[in-house]
């Protein structure tokens, strides 16, 4: 099998993008895992597959696969790369695009400076919508993990997210606690786990352990989740700059019942062929 692909990155979150708008495309879980391997494959955090629209209300559909082959419903950094790919490959001349994923519809717009803005949808805090096992709705929950109690906020923005407020981000804790929480029994579908350090009401630092992938240099949807959780409990303002190891994103959220908007860069790294 020969697969033409484009390698892209958004804030260091890297992707393999495949155009399946004209020819149907399918990989098995084992093939995705092989392609994701950074020593024996191409290497990526997520695989993005662009497909024709499922209905007339959107311009394209795109599928998102983690490095372990699991399909997920949201990827903010990937959405920005999709917008740049569609423009570069002349798949559409629209200034604004609507694209569907497994469970969301996103609105994409390339800004004059080349950055891409994505309307990520309305944050959902009800435990049953995340899903998260809890007796009621709260700003923060106390979760038992091994021999400690962890305070976290939860929200769904296309994917389940757990946000842990910390005074200072500890790299070892991100790897160990993040891995444990990403598959915790309180999250029936797993979760992306963000460690949020509030610098001031307009700036936070964030590191993320993604389910099915591990720690990444950036996670757009978790950046949105962190701002939503921080705004909900009065820690943050409407516009927040989120600094992650791979770069910074600007997140805007006016409040309940309104969508979160994320703005940041997206870059093509190289094009190639994968032979299996």
UniProtKB/Swiss-Prot annotation:
Alphabetical keyword list: Amino-acid biosynthesis, Cytoplasm, Isomerase, Lysine biosynthesis
Catalysed reaction, written as an equation: (2S,6S)-2,6-diaminopimelate = meso-2,6-diaminopimelate
Record-linked InterPro entries: DAP_epimerase_AS, DAP_epimerase_DapF
UniProt binding sites for substrate: 13, 46, 66, 76-77, 159, 192, 210-211, 220-221
Site description Could be important to modulate the pK values of the two catalytic cysteine residues, residues in chain: 161, 210
Pathway of action: Amino-acid biosynthesis; L-lysine biosynthesis via DAP pathway; DL-2,6-diaminopimelate from LL-2,6-diaminopimelate: step 1/1
Molecular function GO labels: diaminopimelate epimerase activity
An individual GO BP term: lysine biosynthetic process via diaminopimelate
Pfam hit, one: DAP_epimerase
EC number: 5.1.1.7
Subcellular location: Cytoplasm
Gene3D superfamilies: Diaminopimelate Epimerase, Chain A, domain 1
Active-site residue numbers: 75 (proton donor), 219 (proton acceptor)
Major subcellular site: cytoplasm
GO CC term, one of those recorded: cytosol
Annotated site residues (Important for dimerization) in this chain: 270
Complexes and interactors: Homodimer.
Family: Belongs to the diaminopimelate epimerase family.
Function recorded in the entry: Catalyzes the stereoinversion of LL-2,6-diaminopimelate (L,L-DAP) to meso-diaminopimelate (meso-DAP), a precursor of L-lysine and an essential component of the bacterial peptidoglycan.
Name the record gives this protein: Diaminopimelate epimerase
Source taxonomy: Bacteria, Pseudomonadati, Pseudomonadota, Gammaproteobacteria, Legionellales
């Amino acid at each position: 099998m020969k697969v033409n692909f484009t390698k892209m990155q958004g804030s260091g979150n890297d992707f393999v993008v495949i155009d399946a708008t004209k020819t149907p495309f399918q990989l098995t879980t084992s093939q995705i895992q092989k392609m994701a391997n950074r020593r024996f494959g191409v290497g990526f955090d997520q695989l993005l597959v662009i497909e024709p629209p499922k209905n007339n209300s959107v311009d394209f559909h795109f599928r998102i696969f983690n490095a372990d082959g699991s399909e997920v419903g949201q990827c903010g950094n990937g959405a920005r790369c999709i917008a740049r790919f569609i423009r570069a490959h002349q798949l559409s001349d629209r200034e604004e695009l609507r694209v569907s994923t497994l469970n969301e519809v996103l609105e994409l717009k390339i800004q004059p400076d080349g950055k891409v803005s994505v309307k990520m949808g309305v944050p959902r805090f009800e435990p049953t919508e995340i899903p998260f096992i809890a007796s009621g709705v709260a700003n923060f929950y106390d979760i038992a993990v091994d021999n400690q109690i962890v305070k976290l906020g939860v929200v769904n923005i296309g994917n389940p997210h757990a946000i842990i407020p910390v005074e200072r981000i500890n790299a070892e804790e991100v790897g160990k606690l993040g891995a444990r929480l990403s598959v915790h029994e309180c999250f029936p579908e797993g979760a992306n786990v963000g460690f949020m350090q509030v610098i001031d009401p307009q700036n936070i630092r964030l590191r993320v352990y993604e389910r099915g992938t591990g720690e990444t240099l950036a996670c757009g949807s978790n950046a949105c989740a962190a701002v939503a959780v921080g705004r909900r409990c009065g820690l943050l303002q409407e516009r927040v700059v989120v600094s992650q190891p791979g770069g910074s994103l600007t997140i805007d959220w006016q409040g309940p019942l309104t969508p979160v908007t994320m703005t940041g860069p997206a870059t093509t790294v190289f094009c190639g062929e994968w032979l299996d």
